[in-house]
Swiss-Prot record:
Record's keyword annotation contains rRNA processing: no
GO BP: mitochondrial electron transport, cytochrome c to oxygen; respiratory chain complex IV assembly
A cellular-component GO term for this protein: respiratory chain complex IV
Location(s), subcellular: Mitochondrion inner membrane
Mitochondrial matrix topological domain: 1-15, 67-72, 153-155, 224-232
GO molecular function, one term: cytochrome-c oxidase activity
Protein name (database record): Cytochrome c oxidase subunit 3
Organism per entry: Hylobates lar (Lar gibbon)
Residues in the Mitochondrial intermembrane compartment per record: 35-40, 106-128, 184-190, 257-261
The keyword Zinc belongs to this UniProt entry's keyword annotation: no
Amino acid sequence: MTHQSHAYHMVKPSPWPLTGALSALLLTSGLAMWFHFHSTTLLTLSMLTNALTMFQWWRDVVREGTYQGHHTMPVQKGLRYGMVLFITSEIFFFAGFFWAFYHSSLAPTPQLGGHWPPTGITPLNPLEVPLLNTSVLLASGVSITWAHHSLMENNRNQMIQALLITILLGIYFTLLQISEYFEAPFTISDGIYGSTFFVATGFHGLHVIIGSTFLTICLIRQLLFHFTSKHHFGFEAAAWYWHFVDVVWLFLYVSIYWWGS
């Protein structure tokens, strides 16, 4: 093993960035095949290669940080900066959807009937399933904070309970969102209202699924004694991401469901 006189982790050559990029290419190609030719073969293959890449890449990161001790304080600081920049990029990603929504709703064109929601669109009642979804996500924000505080206090059992509650609330939110989509009286092809509604809420739903997966991995790692009160950036990053998902939903609820209806 070569000697190094610095605290930074010099990452070994890894195949996972390459397989990840190829999997992403397969995923986008598979989606195009599914949309235009109704074939899910390439999409299924891409999901499999994506899952294998993520599992093996994250496995290597866990080995480097938990078992080999490569995640020193400067390395953790860099990871924190990376996560902050990632969440910032996600904020701008959703800002584009809000821009599209407000651009269309604040000055409706004559083609939309000159008012919002457009003529012929029956919006969802914001006081029914959307309000329940809001309550579920806010409750999950409380439980993830409870899990974080329990971890800081070395209370292992409470941390596991709170994290499990958060994951279950995330799954419940996803199921409610799916049921809402099936019951919606409009579709993604119903003009600007349908497209902005389903794209904005759909991408948020995708982020909830990603966040739930992130938290499930953290739960497994906690069960395997990977986290301590001093060394748990994986969980901290997941908690940041979950709070971001919470805040985005509040903006979606106020803008699209409540004001937009």
